[in-house]
């Protein structure tokens, strides 16, 4: 079985944890970090049933950078 390395981010939003895959922009959520990642894994498995892993955008060394957004 082949494998692909994917970059993911998890954060708490209200009562839930949100998980986001940076390579595909697919997200999921759960009551814990582990549950959010497990649900993301399931969503990615469904996604890759119809899409080639080569379609995943390559993300190397992602960095979280703060940005102040000004709006009216």
Where are these regions (language model features)?
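Short, charged, surface-exposed hinge/linker loops at domain edges
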Residues: 1-5, 34, 38-72
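Short aromatic-glycine-(Arg/Gly/Cys) micro-motifs in beta-strand/loop hairpins
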Residues: 4, 9-21
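Compositionally biased, intrinsically disordered low-complexity segments
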Residues: 12-13, 29, 67-72
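A short, exposed loop/beta-hairpin motif centered on an aromatic-Gly-Thr core
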Residues: 24-33
């Amino acid at each position: 079985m082949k494998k692909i390395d994917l970059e993911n981010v998890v954060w708490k939003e209200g009562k839930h944890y949100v998980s986001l895959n940076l390579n595909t922009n697919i997200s999921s959520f759960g009551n814990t970090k582990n549950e959010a990642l497990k649900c993301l894994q399931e969503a990615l498995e469904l996604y890759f049933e119809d899409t080639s892993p080569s379609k995943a955008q390559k993300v190397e060394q992602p960095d979280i950078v703060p940005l102040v957004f000004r709006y009216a």
